[in-house]
Amino acid sequence: MPTYRSKTSTAGRNMAGARSLWRATGMKDDDFSKPIIAVVNSFTQFVPGHVHLKDLGQLVAREIEAAGGVAKEFNTIAVDDGIAMGHDGMLYSLPSRDIIADSVEYMVNAHCADAMVCISNCDKITPGMLMAAMRLNIPVIFVSGGPMEAGKTRLANPVTKAIEVKKLDLVDAMVIAVDPSYSDAEVAEVERSACPTCGSCSGMFTANSMNCLTEALGLSLPGNGTVVATHADREQLFKRAGRRIVELTRQHYEQDDERVLPRSVGFKAFENAMTLDIAMGGSTNTILHLLAIAQEAGIDFTMKDIDRLSRVVPQLCKVAPNTNKYHIEDVHRAGGIMAILGELDRAGKLHTDVPTVHTPSLKDALDQWDIVRTQDDAVRTFYQAGPAGVPTQVAFSQNTRWPSLDLDRAEGCIRSYEHAFSKEGGLAVLTGNIALDGCVVKTAGVDESILVFEGTAHVTESQDEAVENILNDKVKAGDVVIVRYEGPKGGPGMQEMLYPTSYIKSKGLGKACALLTDGRFSGGTSGLSIGHCSPEAAAGGAIGLVRDGDKIRIDIPNRTINVLVSDEELARRREEQNAKGWKPAQPRPRKVSAALKAYAKLVMSADKGAVRDLSLLDD
C-alpha cells in the first residue's frame, strides 16, 4: 500500500518545524491526517486564456476541502503565443513548456503533495503540465479555462460586396491586416471583434486541441475542451474536479489502485489522443507535445505511430482555421469531444478499454456522454451550452443555450465515418531526402488542388527574412518558401510561423505556394505549410542543404517530400556545409539570451518532441 507522500513533511516528531510552517499557512491539527492536493494554477493578466483564472484555483480548493482534502495553490508561468508572435518573444514560447513542467515538479516534490488539479488553458501550459503529470505520476485531473467565444462582425463580401455577418478569430485579424482590399476602418473593426471574451482562441488551434486531447487521454472531465469559458456550465467542471481528485487520491493511497495514476493511461490512450487529433484536424503542435508527453511517461510512442494512424483515421470534424463555418463552440453543440470519440468508436478506430478520471473505462464514458447513444437528458442539455455574444473577461458569466443540438452526422460539424470529410485524417507525416526523420502537415487545411505540389525553393534563413520577402512580393506563385535554422536548437526555441503563412494567404498565394520549415506552426495555420522538418538544419538536417532554385516535390497522398537533387550533389553540399558549420550563411541580428542558449544545448529535434537529450547529462 503506498504511503501518502505528504507524511514526509507532516508526520513524526522530527517534522515539528515543517508542521509549524504548515500551520502558518492555515493548517489545523486535523488537517495533518488529510491528503495535501496541489492546485496548479496558471493565472496571468498577460494572456486572455488565463486572465479569468485568478479565482478559479480557490473555487477548486474549496471543493477539495469540502471533500476532505487540504488544498494548496501555486502558479506557473504562461506565455501567450499570439502576443509573442512575429518578434523575438516567440523564441521563449516552446522553452516555456519545459520551464512549466520543471516548476510543477519542483513545487510538488519540494512540498510532498499527494495529488494535483492542473488548471491550464493555452498553448504550452497544458503540455507542460501534462509532462509534469507523467513525470510525477501522482493522481491528477486537468481542467482548462475553456475556449473563447468566436468573434462576429459585419463586413463586405470581397466578391459580391454585400454586407455579411462574419464569424472571426485571431487569424482573421492577422490576415485582413495585410490585405490592401480592406480599409483601415474595417481592419480596426475586425481587430476589436476577433477576440471578444476571455478564453483560449476560438478555433481548433493548439490550446483547444490540447485541451480536447486531455479528454481522449482520460485525464479531464467531458466538456473540458469545448464548453466556452464564459458559460456557467464550466463552473461545474471545476467543482467536480475538486471533489473527484480527493476520491482518486484515496483510491491510490488507501486502496492501492494504480489505475488512477496518469501513467496508467498507457500506449492505447496515446493512440486514442492522436486518433482524435487526426480526426478533428487539430494543430500540428499537438504532435510535438504528445511525443514529449509520451517520453515523460516512458511510453514508446513515435512519429512512426503517428504516420501509421494518419493513413487510416478519417477526418470527422473540420473547424477554424480549416473552415470559416465552425468554431469550438460549434463542436460543443454537436456533442463535443465525446461525440467525435463516439464516431471513432463506431468506426472501429478507438481503444475503449482504457481508464478515465471519471469512469472505469472510456467505454463507460461514451455510454454516458456520447449524445448519439446516451439516454441522459442532462447530458444533452449540457452540450447545448453556447455563446452569449457579449464581450467579457469574466468566467461563468452567462447561461445561454443553443435551441437545438447539431446531430447531423452527414453534413454537420461532426461527421460519421460514412460521411467523413476525408477517409484519411487531418494530419500527415511526410518523409524523404529533405526530412529523413519526418515533417508534419495539417492536411485539413490544404486545398485538394495542391496535395501534390512541385515548386522552386525560395530559401530564407529566418522567419524575419521570410516575412520581409513575402511582404515585398519576392515570393511568387510556384515557390516553396524554405525557412530554416528556426528549429528547437537553431532558433533557438522553434518559432511558430503564423505570420509567414498568414501573409502568403493575404497575398493570394494560399493555393500557389508551399512553406517548409524546421520551425513549427501556430494552430491557426492553414495552407500547404509543412513544419517540424527533422533533423533540423542546426543539427545537420538536409533542409540546410537546399539552395535557391532547387525543385522540391511534395506528395501528401504518398507521404513524401524530396528535393530533386542527386544523392551525389547532396553529399557534396554536406561536405561543404560541414566545413562551414551548420549555421545561417549570414549572422542574424538576433539576441539570444543565456537562458535560450542553455535550452539549445540540450534540446533535440522535433521528431523527438523537442525534449531535452538527457544522455548529455550522464556522468
From Swiss-Prot:
Reported cofactor(s): [2Fe-2S] cluster; Mg(2+)
Residues annotated for [2Fe-2S] cluster binding in this entry: 122, 201
PROSITE patterns for this protein: ILVD_EDD_1, ILVD_EDD_2
Presence of the UniProt keyword Iron in the record: yes
GO biological process terms on file: isoleucine biosynthetic process; L-valine biosynthetic process
Family: Belongs to the IlvD/Edd family.
PANTHER family (UniProt xref): D-XYLONATE DEHYDRATASE, D-XYLONATE DEHYDRATASE YAGF-RELATED
Function: Functions in the biosynthesis of branched-chain amino acids. Catalyzes the dehydration of (2R,3R)-2,3-dihydroxy-3-methylpentanoate (2,3-dihydroxy-3-methylvalerate) into 2-oxo-3-methylpentanoate (2-oxo-3-methylvalerate) and of (2R)-2,3-dihydroxy-3-methylbutanoate (2,3-dihydroxyisovalerate) into 2-oxo-3-methylbutanoate (2-oxoisovalerate), the penultimate precursor to L-isoleucine and L-valine, respectively.
UniProt protein name: Dihydroxy-acid dehydratase 1
Gene that produces this protein: ilvD1
